[in-house]
């Protein structure tokens, strides 16, 4: 399952196990922000959502920082038009648009595309498989995403896993 894949993946800052103080600091921030974001979504606290989303943008290292990749994975499923959490779209939009100058140009473009539900083909396929909820083996699709960049794929999958958790919380029968 996705949990097994992510728990054994050490490339993501969400799972950082090393002793680099800088990475440890970012990893701690990412985990704290992730928990806060999930809490705000569950409590439907739309007032504070843009502020938390802004803190994710640009957080991490590389061409597409971990915080950005996490948001891309989260939005891929959570902001589907028929999803009960689609009501949070304006908050994600506001948070990302206000903070896109905090990240790399390529990541800013990726985040904007994610707001429009535009993803690379393998992510689109994975989302479609999850929406269709057919009893097919999607493990190969998870692995394809996992292999994107040095940590981008695993960071996106962390976001997707949280989106699936929240979908279960909000009631998955609303997703078309």
Question: For each predicted feature, which ranges?
Answer:
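Non-transmembrane, aqueous-exposed alpha-helical and coiled segments at domain scale
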Residues: 1-176
């Amino acid at each position: 399952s996705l949990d097994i894949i992510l728990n054994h993946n050490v490339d993501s800052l969400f799972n950082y196990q090393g002793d680099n103080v800088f990475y440890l600091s970012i990893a701690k921030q990412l985990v704290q922000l992730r928990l806060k974001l999930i809490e705000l979504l569950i409590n439907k606290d739309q007032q504070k959502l843009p502020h938390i989303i802004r803190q994710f943008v640009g957080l991490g290292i590389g061409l597409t920082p971990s915080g950005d990749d996490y948001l891309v994975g989260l939005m891929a499923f959570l902001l589907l038009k028929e999803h009960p959490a689609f009501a949070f779209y304006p908050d994600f939009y506001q948070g990302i648009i206000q903070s896109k100058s905090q990240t790399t140009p390529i990541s800013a473009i990726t985040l904007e595309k994610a707001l429009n539900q535009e993803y690379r083909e393998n992510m689109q396929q994975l989302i479609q498989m999850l929406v269709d909820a057919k009893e097919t083996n999607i493990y190969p699709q998870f692995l394809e995403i996992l292999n994107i960049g040095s940590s981008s794929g695993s960071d996106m999958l962390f976001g997707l896993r949280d989106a699936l958790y929240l979908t279960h919380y909000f009631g998955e029968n609303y997703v078309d």
